[in-house]
Every structure is written in structure tokens, then in C-alpha cells.
């Protein structure tokens, strides 16, 4: 009887799907009663193909076992925690500043860490952006600009002659102009008024040049027909012109037919 029950138990358990293999029971106990998700074959091969950690890296064999973390991570953690260089983003390479080289041999003071430490005289700001460099003033610039020097930087004002930031007396005191300030100011106002008058002039309508294009042939044909009709009306007597203007298109055709018959008779 006992032998019969022992041979029947595996079959019943297989049908009920309640048979626990020793390996499965260990997995369930380690994960809190939850069954683990099977890993992909590529992931398992990737862990096996990791480069082995060097013997002098300070990584123990227990850390290099599969299941805790990858060997590459173990090497990085050992380097960060040890005396070796930290693993991370590489720093910018130092460059030599030739302006600070004294005897041809660059020293420690000549090292500059990147382009942000270049002097402002070279046109570069601390953030690495290039400053806007103004060209020096010329005689032509002084004739159309304010030119009053700034009390802080000493740079001349680049506003036009009608600048409202500076007084007229300070503008007159600027040296280097070809004419007096009053004459230059009058010429400046005259030029501006002339430009405004030219802008107010209406532009001409379509011309021969405008109608000469391939896309404007229809417009040219219509204008030519309109001119021919105007010339035909001007050749008629005054009473017939008034009748032609007041009549409808059909009446105009009838009038032209009657006029042609009268001429023939």
C-alpha cells in the first residue's frame, strides 16, 4: 500500500503543478516567495564575457562573483575608493600661454586651464564668448556721429548728431571734424528730410519693362487693346463718343454696324 501511494504522488503533484523542485524552492526563499524572471541569454553571456579585473586592483574574489555586480563596476569602485585616479569625465588639458613665457621654458605660472582663462585683451570673456570689438573712429564717423567721450571708459559716443544724451556744447567741443558742428547738423537734417520726401513719392504703375516678361503677356495684350479702343473713340465725332460711352456692349456693336453701313452708302 505504501509503495503504491509513493508511486502515485509524483503523478498527482505533476497534474496539480504543485511539485517543488529543490532549486525552485531555494529561489523562492531568497526572493521573499516571488518567482524570479528568467534572464535573457544575451545578458547572461555579457556577464560572462566581462574583462577580468586585474590582480593588483584590490578587488576580492567575492566581489567578482556573478550575482553581486559586474567585474567592471567592481574595478571602478575599487579605483574610486583607493588611491588611484578617479574614473569619470576627463579634465581639460592645460595649454601654454606664450605671452607669459619668460625665458622660453614654460613654468607653472604659464599654464592656463582652457580657453576661459585667456586675458580679456584678446577679446574673450570669462564665459568663452567673443566680445564685440568696435573699430576706431575716423573723420567720416565724426562727421555723422556724436563723438563725445564717455567719462568712465573714454570711448566716444556712437549715436548720431541728434544724440539727446549729451549737450550741444559738449558736441561742439569735439575735435577732429571737417566742418563746424552746426553745419554738419544742418546737412544731416537736410539729408533725412530728402530721404523722407523720396519715400512719400508714389511709385509708377506697370511699364513696358514690367509687361515684357513671359508671365505678363496677358496684361500687355489687355493694355494694347485698351489703348486701341481709346484711340478709336478719339477719332469719332463728339456726339458719337458720348453715345459709345453711354451704351452697352451690344448697343455699341449695333452702332458700329450702322455707322459702317452709312459710310458704305
Swiss-Prot record:
Residues 1-18 form the signal peptide. Gene3D superfamilies: 6.10.140.670. Residues 133-200 form the SCA7 domain. One of its GO terms (cellular component) is SAGA complex. The keyword Secreted does not apply. Keywords: Signal. Residues 81-105 are annotated as: Disordered. PANTHER family: SAGA-ASSOCIATED FACTOR 73. This is SCA7 domain-containing protein SELMODRAFT_431321. The lineage of its organism: Eukaryota, Viridiplantae, Streptophyta, Embryophyta, Tracheophyta.
